[in-house]
Swiss-Prot record:
Keywords: Chaperone, Cytoplasm, Stress response. It comes from Geobacillus stearothermophilus. This is Co-chaperonin GroES. It is found in: Cytoplasm. GO terms for cellular component: cytoplasm. The keyword Kinase does not apply. The keyword Chaperone applies. Belongs to the GroES chaperonin family.
Amino acid sequence: MLKPLGDRVVIEVIETEEKTASGIVLPDTAKEKPQEGRVVAVGKGRVLDSGERVAPEVEVGDRIIFSKYAGTEVKYDGKEYLILRESDILAVIG
């Protein structure tokens, strides 16, 4: 399993099927970049200048919304993941 370092978080992107108002399904090239995902791994948190470690606010299993162009896409064990900094997470859903 991927183990993120520092304040990084590994997420599995949740793809949504996009349709127009008339019901036409859009091809991948016309879709918006996804901004929703589920946390699958969390680093230990960031270290302040004082040496104190700040624990992450998200947990494994959280459903999140993140910045549109944030993170690095990686493929591991046949699945695609996104590794991003905790600061790129905008909100936890529910």
